[in-house]
A protein has these predicted regions:
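S-adenosyl-L-methionine-dependent methyltransferase catalytic module, highlighting the catalytic core
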Residues: 160-168, 178-291
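A short His-aromatic
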Residues: 154-158
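Conserved N-terminal segment of class I S-adenosyl-L-methionine
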Residues: 1-145, 149-153, 163-166, 240-241, ...
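Basic phosphate/pyrophosphate-binding loop/patch that engages nucleotide-derived ligands
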Residues: 171
Length: 292
């Protein structure tokens, strides 16, 4: 790493404090802008190993298509109705095995992908026949102003340099282009983690694993907005993400109970969102859309 001491990717401050009770997760928070992140950040090959493990163990790629199908279609419908022109060029960053690209293509988009996994890239090229770049967005050599929409769905939190990633996305978007981001909501994950931490004996008795998820970066609505503004974006809309189905992490053994838990969580947080006029956003994941 370039620095042995933690520093903030968003504002550059080194006024960083480790969070409790998150010592095991190595979570730190910037005291200036409140961005939360792990430190030290892992090397790139370790990140690749984590991504490959995710697609083979935690969330096998065969299950992704069905689990996120409804979410993908709702997002595409929203983009088509609100933002995208008739000629639609999409770049899906962290495209995995190309399921979002495939759905977009079926709806008339010209889909391109970026993926760090060799297996994912080969699958997309050989099975789906879409153009895909192996690597990360920062080093990709696309021409500026090439795309109408760039999607980073559950991806930005795993980027070692999310600010530079967003700045590169800004350059690659056409005028009035759109970036669509889905990521875990730090506020929700923190609440769940604290409940599990202080009631751990009870969850251990029921053999329920800790459901909270913290990646390299953990964004709240305010910190993702600050980062998008710093990258040059405007007209930033943040809301609770649409639901995905299933329980890929195996937290709830009953699929019916998993579905009920998700639905109740989603609609209770939606009520908070609407009754607060969009000021309280506590869903498990955020959907963020911003314009160039």
């Amino acid at each position: 790493m370039e620095s042995k001491n933690p520093y903030c990717n968003l504002c550059g401050s080194n006024n960083i404090k480790q969070l409790t009770p998150f010592q095991k997760e190595r979570l730190y928070r910037c005291q200036k802008c409140h961005l939360v992140f792990r430190w030290p950040l892992p090397e790139n090959d370790m990140i690749l190993n984590q991504v490959e493990k995710h697609y083979t163990e935690a969330d096998p790629h065969q299950s992704v298509a069905s689990a996120k199908n409804k979410f993908f279609n709702k997002l595409l419908e929203h983009l088509e109705n609100k933002y995208a022109p008739q000629e639609r060029e999409l770049l899906d960053v962290g495209c995995g095995y190309g399921y979002f690209m495939q759905l977009a293509s079926e709806r008339g988009w010209r889909a391109h992908g970026i993926e760090i996994m060799e297996k994912g890239c080969l699958y997309i090229k050989e099975k789906l026949n879409f153009p895909v770049y192996k690597g990360d967005l920062i080093e990709a050599d696309y021409a500026q102003q090439s795309f109408d929409v760039i999607s980073l769905l559950d991806v930005l939190v795993m980027c070692p340099d999310p600010l530079l990633t967003l700045k590169k996305a800004y350059l690659l978007l056409k005028k009035k282009g759109v970036v669509a981001i889905r990521l875990r909501n730090y506020y929700f994950q923190r609440i769940i983690h604290q409940v599990y931490h202080y009631g751990g004996w009870l969850f251990s008795k029921w053999k329920i694993p800790n459901p909270s998820v913290f990646h390299l970066y953990s964004f709240s609505p305010s910190t993702i907005k600050k980062m998008l503004l710093k990258a040059g974006f405007n007209n930033i809309k943040i809301k609770n993400s649409y639901l995905t189905t299933g329980d890929p992490y195996g937290i709830v053994k009953s699929s019916f109970l998993a579905k009920i838990t998700k639905v109740l969580t989603y609609y209770s947080t939606q009520l908070l969102y609407y009754f607060s006029f969009g000021k309280i956003i506590l869903g498990p994941s955020l959907l963020v859309i911003a314009n160039k």
